[in-house]
Amino acid sequence: MPPRAGMRYALPNRSMLQSSIFIRTMTKIRRPPSSRNIPQTELPSGRTPVLAIVPMPPDANPHGHVFGGWIMSQMDIAGAVAAVQRARGRVSTVAVNTLTFLAPIRVGERTLFYADVARVGNTSVTCKVEAYTEHNIHAPTEVRKVSEALFTYVAMDENDQPRPVDQPPTACP
C-alpha cells in the first residue's frame, strides 16, 4: 500500500528484514491514546496498596500496553490478600463479578493495587479492587485510575472444601 499524506510509517529495521513477513512492507505507527482523554486523579489517601508492581515488556503487546489478562491476574492476587486476611486462612477465587478497564497501562508505569472487603457471606468474601498507575516513578505527577473490579473468594478448609468465614481453619497435621 503506498504511503498516504498525513500517515506516519516506520521502515523495518535490520532484524525485521531477516523475516520474510516484513520484507518490502511498512508498518503503520499507531499513537497511544492521548492522556488528555484519561482523567488524572490522586492516590487514595489513608489507604495502603496491597500490591505494587512495574509491568515489563513481556507483559505488553507490541504497542507497549499491558495485556488485560495480566492486569486481571494482579487484581486477583491483590483481592486474595484482603480475602485471606478477613477469612483468616486459604481462599479460592470463585467469581469475577465485574472488571472494568478504564485506561491502558503502559510498560514501566508503577501500578498500585488497593483491595478492600466489600461483603462477607457465610463462606465467601467479596473484595473491591482498584488499580492506579504513576507515570513517573521518581516524581509521581500523573496518577490515573486504570481499572476496578469485584472478586468473590470462598474460604477453604484443609480438604479444599468451603468453610464458614468466621470459623478459623483447623491446623494441618
Protein language model features and the residues they cover:
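HotDog/MaoC-like acyl-thioester-processing domains
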Residues: K28-S45, P49-L51, R106-V107, A118-P173
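A conserved, well-ordered hydrophobic junction motif at loop->secondary-structure transitions
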Residues: P58-Q74
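Small beta-barrel nucleic-acid-binding modules, principally OB-folds
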Residues: R88-P104
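Intrinsically disordered, low-complexity segments enriched in small polar residues
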Residues: G6, S15, S19-S20
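Active-site helix/loop of acyl-thioester processing domains in fatty-acid/polyketide metabolism
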Residues: G69-G89, D157
